[in-house]
């Protein structure tokens, strides 16, 4: 077995027969799949519906802010740490924070945009819960800044974990 290129796609070729073992996906097939609602990623495919369900199932809140500092997306998990409404879509992220913290928001965004930093994290007490908030610079393959992703998670119960749990203990 050897690696080969078909067009710009990688495939595996049987060294005895020379026939491809894995069919390379042609560009036209990728376009057709996208038109049918299938999203093509470097590591696989899924539908928009599947992706949205995955993002909403994650045990974290996700908010994405684009390179122009506008809120573009938030996950709508059932138990969000911080409530969001669709009214924030398109709004400058600075307008979504208390005035006294806007200078911190700008410092994080500026550091991400210039490439000085890629992560900022905080943890805060909200009532009796410990909330972990992380900001990540989102970059393309060439390192170009695309925006910022905020990930918030209630870690109160996670902090209580001790030892190991190796077996399923569901009560039927």
Predicted regions and their residues:
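Terminal output helix/cap of sensory domains in signal transduction proteins
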Residues: 96-127
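Sensory-domain boundary capping and coupling elements
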Residues: 149-152
């Amino acid at each position: 077995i050897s690696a080969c290129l078909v067009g710009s796609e990688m495939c595996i070729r049987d060294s005895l027969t020379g026939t491809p073992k894995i069919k390379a996906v042609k560009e036209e097939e990728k376009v057709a799949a996208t038109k049918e609602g299938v999203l093509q990623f470097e590591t696989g495919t899924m539908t928009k519906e599947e992706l949205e369900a995955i993002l909403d199932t994650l045990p974290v809140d996700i908010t994405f802010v684009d390179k122009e500092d506008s809120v573009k997306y938030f996950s709508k998990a059932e138990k969000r740490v911080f409530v969001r409404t669709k009214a924030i879509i398109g709004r400058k992220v600075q307008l979504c924070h208390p005035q006294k913290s806007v200078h911190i928001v700008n410092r994080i965004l500026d550091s991400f945009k210039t490439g000085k930093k890629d992560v900022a994290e905080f943890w805060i007490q909200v009532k009796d819960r410990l909330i972990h908030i992380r900001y990540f610079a989102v970059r393309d393959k060439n390192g170009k800044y695309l925006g910022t992703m905020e990930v918030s998670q209630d870690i109160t119960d996670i902090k209580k974990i001790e030892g190991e749990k190796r077996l399923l203990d569901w009560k039927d």
